Amino acid sequence: MLYTVIVLTGMVLAGIAAAFVIELLVVALFPNVSAPGQHLTKGKGLPLKELVPSDRRRDVTFEVEGTSISAWLYLPRGQSSPVPCIVMAHGLGGTKKMLEPYVTRFQDAGMAVLVFDYRYLGESNGEPRQLIWIPYQLQDYAAAVAYARSLKEVDADRVGLWGTSLSGGHVLVTAARDGRIACVSAQCPLLDGLAASEQQLHRLGIRYALRMLGHAQRDLVRSWLGLSPHKIPIVGRTGSLALMSDDDAWDFFAESASDDFVNEACARIAMNIYRYRPVDHLHQVRCPVLLQTCDHDFALPSKVVDKAASRLGAFAEIVRYPIGHFDIYRGSHFETAVNRQIEFFSKHLFPTDSK
């Protein structure tokens, strides 16, 4: 009797496993499956080549596992000795060109800035294009820090990190892994991908979640089989199939996207991001952290901010704003946030007798 039960159980489990494999293959190989495109009419953007004098910015590159990463190094005027440096990159799908408003402000405050594009995005190399994969982006941040420390113009013991949204989580994880980081500024950071996904499910519904899962599975399995990637929009109107399905997100990117921003990403990131929980690393951070959070952030529940504050303890400086996720990039909210960041970096990157 026991033997029969074991055999039947094994057959049932094998059947379930086979059905799952068949489902994945069908999802991956079924022809003519695509996500509706979201054509983004971009604003005028930032005329970077005109606004930034060549003597204030250098084009530099460094490599990660044989792939060249494109970066810009900004140095403060009148530099006579190694200076502190801020290492930074954008959030979900953003490029270094879109961070110019922050970079020039930090540079004017006397700091060097190394801003880079992740592999597969912007002006960096790597195939497939538009691959957003969290472990790779964390490697890129670590490599950028190492490169900054190797520069003769930079004080290797005064390297800080800046991140926003998805990269706001990256800089916290990077600081948890690298005890030499001097300080971290994380703006509207992704702290808990699972909590953010649950909030997204509540806002957009189960149909959206199931459609997103199907597209993510298709791309992931196709990558295992060596097939071309399956892509979905990064940003779309509320209710559309996009990684950021939100009218405010759409309006922000329409206003601010750079000419090298491409509104699509390999769909597999949707299966990677919900497991990403930087909040679980915060107990390992041993440097000052500025957390600027938005009370109406679609990706950051207030309970997660409270958890982050508890785990960071005395290292945390938390500033909450009664605004949405994308408001912090605009107008007076941007000015308030960036001025606080300059104050924070100046305090922790400059010795009291050096500025």
Task: Kindly label every feature range from the protein language model.
Residues 170-255:
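Alpha/beta-hydrolase-fold enzymes
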Residues 103-126:
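Conserved alpha/beta-hydrolase
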